């Protein structure tokens, strides 16, 4: 697998290098890894490609959802037989998932959950098929995967970052404060499996009036992928604010203050991903100076 990965055409959402130890951390050590879902293509003992089929986690993040299969990765060595190998691997993966009871197959992730390769593919999340992943796009099109939505990838350089300052935000600041927690407790089994070894930060929104938590946002270090970009970066995830508090404009305060704190810790870039249909989050990020960097595609194939 390391040799296959080394020969891939480069694009920003694919880690430039991997090693046996990195694959152990991001793939083989997961408690739900099944060797039968890792399918290799060889010719005269030479690796031509691999596909990894697995399952999404359920909405609670506490167990696998075997009815929802995921093609986590499909990587093929460029060359004369690349298309033939890619098609053969995809068919083998689909057959494996169907025999295991899957009713649907997603590529990359059932957003925002991806059981493997976080830190090697995508960014702050695995957005399905990453932009510029021509290999994945071609094989999914051939096998009849249907697009189900777009995931917008936002990025914000923290050079010279300034949070929003206006009358409304000054009022919010008087009513709320931010608590920063390094290496916070893991919020789900799924988070423990995919991010448990990474550096993480959580920022909580505290109501000064009663000391209650009204929201939070988390970040992780996106390694080893961020190392390929040559910048110290963190990925935003799990932004949650009480509906009543959100109407007060506190989401802007929470995210802005958390980003300001990270900038003070020499973080150079923040990435966030959200569904293109999530207009409130898209608007919030753009208000804070995040720019639309790329688009991922969610795709699904029905097996029934």
Language-model features, listed with the residues they occupy:
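Conserved acetyl-CoA-binding loop-helix of GNAT-fold acetyltransferases
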Residues: 81-98, 241, 247-264, 282-287
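Conserved hydrophobic beta-strand within the GNAT/NAT acetyltransferase core sheet
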Residues: 105-107, 236, 270-274
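A short, internal acetyl-CoA/4′-phosphopantetheine-binding micro-motif in the GNAT/acyltransferase core
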Residues: 71-83, 109-113, 238-247
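A conserved beta-turn-beta hairpin within the catalytic core of GNAT-like acetyltransferases
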Residues: 57-71, 81, 223-236, 246, ...
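Conserved active-site alpha-helix within GNAT-family acetyltransferase domains
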Residues: 99, 112-147, 252, 276-294
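Conserved beta-strand in the GNAT
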Residues: 38-40, 46-56, 70, 204, ...
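Short amphipathic alpha-helix that is part of the acyltransferase structural core
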Residues: 1-26, 38-40, 146-153, 160-195, ...
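A structural microfeature
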Residues: 49, 144, 149-152, 214-215, ...
């Amino acid at each position: 697998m390391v040799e296959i990965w080394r020969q891939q055409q480069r694009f920003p959402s694919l880690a430039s290098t991997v090693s046996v130890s990195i694959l152990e951390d991001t793939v083989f050590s997961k408690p739900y890894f099944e060797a039968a879902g890792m399918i290799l293509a060889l010719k005269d003992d030479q690796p031509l490609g691999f596909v990894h089929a697995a399952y999404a986690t359920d909405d609670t993040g506490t167990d696998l959802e075997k009815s929802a299969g995921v093609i986590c990765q499909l990587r093929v060595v460029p060359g004369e037989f690349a298309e033939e190998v890619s098609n053969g691997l995809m068919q083998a993966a689909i057959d494996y998932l169907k025999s295991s009871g899957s009713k649907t197959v997603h590529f990359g992730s059932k957003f925002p959950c991806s059981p493997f390769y976080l830190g090697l593919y995508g960014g702050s999340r695995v957005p399905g098929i990453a932009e510029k992943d021509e290999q994945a796009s071609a094989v999914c099109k051939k096998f009849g995967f249907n697009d189900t939505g777009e995931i917008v990838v936002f990025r914000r350089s923290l050079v010279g970052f300034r949070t929003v300052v206006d009358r409304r935000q000054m009022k919010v600041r008087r009513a709320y404060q931010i608590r920063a927690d390094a290496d916070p407790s893991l919020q789900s089994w799924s988070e423990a499996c995919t991010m448990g070894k990474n550096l993480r930060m959580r920022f909580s929104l505290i109501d000064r009036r009663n000391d209650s938590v009204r929201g939070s946002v988390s970040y992780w270090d996106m390694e080893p992928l961020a190392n390929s970009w040559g910048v110290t970066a963190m990925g935003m995830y799990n932004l949650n604010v009480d509906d009543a508090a959100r109407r007060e404009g506190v989401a802007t305060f929470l995210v802005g203050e958390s980003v300001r704190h990270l900038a003070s810790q020499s973080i150079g870039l923040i990435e966030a991903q959200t569904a293109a249909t999530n207009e409130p989050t898209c608007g919030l990020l753009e208000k804070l100076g995040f720019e639309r960097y790329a688009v991922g595609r969610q795709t699904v194939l029905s097996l029934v």
